[in-house]
Every structure is written in C-alpha cells, then in structure tokens.
C-alpha cells in the first residue's frame, strides 16, 4: 500500500508541473520538483508555494521568474530576487503572506527591488578615509637607452 502512495505522489509531481516537459524544466532549473499550493505571486512574476507535508524549512519555496528588471534570469537565479514583503513569509517570520496581510510601508524599503550587485561593476565600494598600510609600488619611469 505504501508503494502505491509513493507512485501516486510521483505522478502528482509530474502532472502538477504541466506534464513531463514542465517537470523536467523545473527539475533542471531548481534541482527539486516539489508540488504545493500556490500562495501568491509578486509584482516581478515570482511564484510562492507552500506544502505543509514537507518538514519545516522546506515547506515554503519560490519559483523564480525568467525575466526580472530587464535581466534574463532563467539559469541565473539569485536569492536576492525575493522582495522584502515575501522574504518574511518565505523564511517563516510570519504565517500571513503579503496577499492576506500587506507589508507596512517603510521609507527604507525600495519601491523597485534591486538585485545583489556583488561582483558586478555596479557593486558598492565604500570610500576609505584612512591611509593604506601597504602602498603599491610604482616603477620609476625612465626612458629606454
């Protein structure tokens, strides 16, 4: 009887993603193919799911959109693509998703969510007011003879 339930759950995972093609697309993109109830969608197109049959910490997840802020994110997904209103629900800080209880407006929360810019030319580099302990060596410029 347990084998039947395992096969039934596997069939639900394949049909829950729109057939074999959709299942393989989700599996290769996220390395996981969970099926749950759709809780909501943010303004960027990310979809948020919940399945309380999973253990705590894996019972809520996001399926990222393929395009966000003009950037193709099909294979290049990043955890910073989750806006702050969904972050608190996704990490179990609250049981109420933003679809039922909207986030209160704060002046430090951006209206347009930004990616993590670490490792890009747009990254934040703070200005240092202290002298360096080690100075770069600049060779003397002498003309060739």
UniProtKB/Swiss-Prot annotation:
Subcellular location(s) of the protein: Mitochondrion inner membrane
Any GO CC annotation of this UniProt entry: mitochondrial inner membrane
InterPro entries tied to this protein: NDUFA12
GO biological process: mitochondrial ATP synthesis coupled electron transport
Membrane-traversing stretches: none
Keywords from the named record: Acetylation, Electron transport, Membrane, Mitochondrion, Mitochondrion inner membrane, Respiratory chain, Transport
Subunit field text: Complex I is composed of 45 different subunits.
Family, per entry: Belongs to the complex I NDUFA12 subunit family.
Function: Accessory subunit of the mitochondrial membrane respiratory chain NADH dehydrogenase (Complex I), that is believed not to be involved in catalysis. Complex I functions in the transfer of electrons from NADH to the respiratory chain. The immediate electron acceptor for the enzyme is believed to be ubiquinone.
Listed name of the protein: NADH dehydrogenase [ubiquinone] 1 alpha subcomplex subunit 12
Organism: Gorilla gorilla gorilla
UniProt lineage: Eukaryota, Metazoa, Chordata, Craniata, Vertebrata
């Amino acid at each position: 009887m347990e084998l039947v339930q395992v096969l039934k759950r596997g069939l639900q995972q394949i049909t829950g993603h729109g057939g074999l093609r959709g299942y393989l697309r989700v599996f290769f993109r996220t390395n996981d193919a969970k099926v749950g109830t759709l809780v909501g969608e943010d303004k960027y197109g990310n979809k948020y799911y919940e399945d309380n049959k999973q253990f705590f910490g894996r019972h809520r997840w996001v399926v990222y959109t393929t395009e966000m802020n003009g950037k193709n994110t099909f294979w290049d997904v990043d955890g910073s693509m989750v806006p702050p209103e969904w972050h608190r629900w996704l990490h179990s800080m609250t049981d109420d998703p933003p679809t039922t209880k909207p986030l209160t407006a704060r002046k430090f929360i951006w209206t347009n969510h930004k990616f993590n810019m670490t490792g890009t030319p747009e990254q934040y580099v703070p200005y240092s007011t202290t002298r360096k302990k080690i100075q770069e060596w600049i060779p003397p410029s002498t003309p060739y003879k």
